[in-house]
Each structure stands twice: as structure tokens, then as C-alpha cells.
Amino acid sequence: QIKLEAFNYLDAAKFVPEYSNEDKAICYGITGGVAKYLSLIDPRKSIDENIIRLFFRTDGYLYDETRNLLTQEFSDIAVVNNIVEQIASGENTLNTIAGKIGEKEPTVLYSLEKLINVGLVEKKKCITEEKNKKKTQYVLKDYMFKFWYEFIPKATSVIEMGQGEIYYEKAVKPVLHSFMGSVFEEMCRYYILMKGITGEYGCFITSVGTWWGVENVADKNGDIRAQSADIDVVALSDIDKMAVIGECKFKNEKIDKGIYDTLIRRGKLITAKYKISKYIFFSLSGYTDWFETLSGEDVLLLTLDSLYE
């Protein structure tokens, strides 16, 4: 059984106490908080040096780790490998995964259930509709696997030539923030649950997750059209029938009014069941000056540093 139990992002940070908060978060993202992988990080070396040393060299411990773990666990390794690759690239429903890899749905479902049992994949449900089977997505639970599948297969030949460092600098480092997007969302959900249990947001938060669905918006011509919509963080208080919703951006650009407007608009899609007590924004790079014009108690502007305070 693989089942690699993971630390939360705060406990994972204790392995690299001298790192900046951004590098602590990235360290959590590439190891998934798994103690075994965290212990491989040399805190005297930079996060970039550690990533190159562990993933982008043929003798790197994590270069072969995913292959080894899957080979030990699964006989139908080709199918499993294809499934994990599809999930890592963003395909997350049974029929799209089956279609992409050319396998029948029952075959894919069998492998997915095994991947869930060993703790590599999890079923994500829309938090306000947990009983709706159609609203189920499959996501990689293990971030180290997610990182590996996102970057290593494409780089194998370059790494085998001994040029993994160049590949990392040119093809991975520039998109590391994009990879960290879903990791940061999970960190923010943990943070809100941790604070919300104590009643910090004016209600007693008992569950946290994500929401997705459809919204109707007007296009440039004023015509109303349906588009898919999601909310990164939705924390619910079923006792108070209240919700806290949030948007997370792990980017080198500030959050602007457009992102604020989108969250306020999408919040209305869940207000039939819950009254929203707080809108919380999480930004790696802060906020534009427009936010200084905001007043009111119901909007909280947080940064990555807030998560580590």
C-alpha cells in the first residue's frame, strides 16, 4: 500500500525554517508534505537546487520514485500511467479520461478506484452538492506525483543527456507559479478551516471545499450566455447556514478589481442556501490600489505571508 501520509503546509515548513514563505510553499508543493520527501530537501541549498537535484538528474531520488511506486502496486501499469497522466494534465471526469486514453469506462473506473485506495487520487465533490454523482472530479491527491507527471515525462531525454538543470531553468521554473495554483488553493482551504473552526469569520465553519457550476453572463454585445464557473474556496457553516468564499492567486501580478467583481458575482450562485459572511482573497503579490477604495467588514485581503503568521 502506497498511502503516504502528509503533513499540512505549516508543519512541512518546519523542515525548511530559513526559507522564504514563497519557497516554503513551493517546497510543500513539490513534496506534497510527505515526510519521506521533505527529509530529502537540503535546507542549506536553494529550492531550485533541491528541485534539480531530486527530480532533474538521473540519480535524483524522485526521478524514478513514481515509476517505482506504481510498478510495485499495479500490474496494469500502462493503463494506470495513462490515467495519472491525464489527471495531471487537467482531465478530471471518468468519460473524458476514458475517451482520451481509448479505454472503456469500467476499465478506467477499476484503476481509478485502486488509485484512490492507495491514496494517489481523490474524488472531489462540489461542496454544495455532495450527493450529486455527476458533480465528481478526479484529482491527484499527491502533489509530488502531480509535479512529476507535469514535468518529468516531457524532459526524460534531456535529463538522460545530463541537461536537466537547463530544462528546469527554461521550461519548469517559469511556470512553477502556475503549477502551484492548485497547491495554494488547498493551503488556503486548510487555513480557512483552521481559523473558521474557532468562529473567526462570524460563523462556525465545519467543512471546506470548492464549488463549480455554470453562470450566465452578458458578452460584449449584451447577449446572455452560459459559461463554466468555479470558486476556489467555499467554507460552510451548516449550523449557521453561512458561507465564507475565497479566490486564490499564486502569481507575480496583483489581484485587481476584475477578480473581486467575479467572486462577488459568483457568490450569488450559492446564496440560495447560504448567507455569505466573508469574501476572502489570497494573493502572492498583493493588490492594486483600487482595493483601497473598498470599505466594509465583509472583505478580507490576505497574502501568502498571512498563511504563515
Predicted regions and their residues:
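Short amphipathic alpha-helical interaction segments
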Residues: 101-118
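A short, conserved structural fragment
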Residues: 116-127
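The alpha-helix within a helix-turn-helix
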Residues: 13, 28, 98-99
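Winged-helix-like regulatory helical subdomains adjacent to P-loop NTPase cores
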Residues: 47-99
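Short, Lys/Arg-rich nucleic-acid/phosphate-binding segment
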Residues: 125-137
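A cross-kingdom feature that marks ATP-driven nucleic-acid transaction machinery
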Residues: 136-309
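Alpha-helical sensor/transducer elements of the RecA-like P-loop NTPase core
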Residues: 1-19
